[in-house]
Amino acid sequence: VNNINADWAKPLDITIDEDQTRQPYILQKIRIGGARRKLQNIRIAVANIKLDIDSCCMGLNGTVVVRNRADFVSFLEAAYNEGKNTVDYLVFPEFYLPISWIQDVLTFTRKTGITVISGLQYISQNGNAHNVITVFSQIKSGRYNSAVLFAREKNNYAPLEKLLVETECCTVLDNNLPIYMVYDDGGVKFGIFLCYEFTDICARALLKNEVDIIFTPENNSDTTYFSNIIETMSRDLHAFMVQANTSIYGDSRI
């Protein structure tokens, strides 16, 4: 911020409270300052993207990331449509977003106010791989619009995912103290689960009476089993479920 406008700048309006009474879990409650949202007017876009096994393994052992940037830009343009048909939330599947595109998403979110939820491609170093879920949100800084990135690693890895990663000479580890997050975004409260995580019934119970919407990026072939869990969660938690899966397996829905 230049000197002329320095008086307008303020710290980012974020509040994070950590509830450690839910052992063996930690529940973080994050309040994001910004425009008020009305739940009854919320619009959500779910990206329909084909991700095969090779695409999901990008990022392991320094694999060169190859992704169709034109498709990515078209998703962003369709979601915003020059402000004519703006959605509030845009959801991509697990493993979709390359790290090199993070700045592009932050810029998009800052300018449009659209919150983006996506899984990152694997991050690997020294034989350890990390599957990460991200939330990009617009936030106010005085009279300015800014954008912030929230990210956390997957708490529980599926047995098949562990085997798949091992074939690429990497290792993934479950979190001994799982962390889940609830976001208060202008009055709309939402949570996130990354694919296999919501097989944990105790983790699902953490969000009871806490959220209006749950976003679940995933790459999952067992759509029958997971569909039953999704429908059960919606009834038990009285929340909207937003599921973004690879188009190879389908079942992306709200």
Question: What would you call each of these model-derived segments?
Answer:
Residues V1-K29, T232-M233, N245-I254:
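C-terminal beta-strand edge segments of enzyme domains
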Residues A9-R37, N128-N209:
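Active-site catalytic loop in hydrolytic enzyme cores
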Residues N41-T63, A151-E153, V188-E197, F215-P217:
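Active-site-proximal beta-strand elements of phosphoester/diester hydrolases
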Residues I49, E94-F95, G119-Y122, N155, ...:
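Active-site-proximal beta-strand/loop segments in catalytic clefts of secreted hydrolases
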Residues A70-F150, N220-D222, R235:
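Cys-nucleophile CN-hydrolase/nitrilase-fold catalytic domain and related Cys-dependent amidase chemistry
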Residues K84-L90, D184-K189, N209-I214:
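Short, surface-exposed connector motifs at secondary-structure boundaries
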Residues D88, I102-I117, F198-I254:
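CN hydrolase (nitrilase-like) catalytic-core segments centered on the catalytic cysteine
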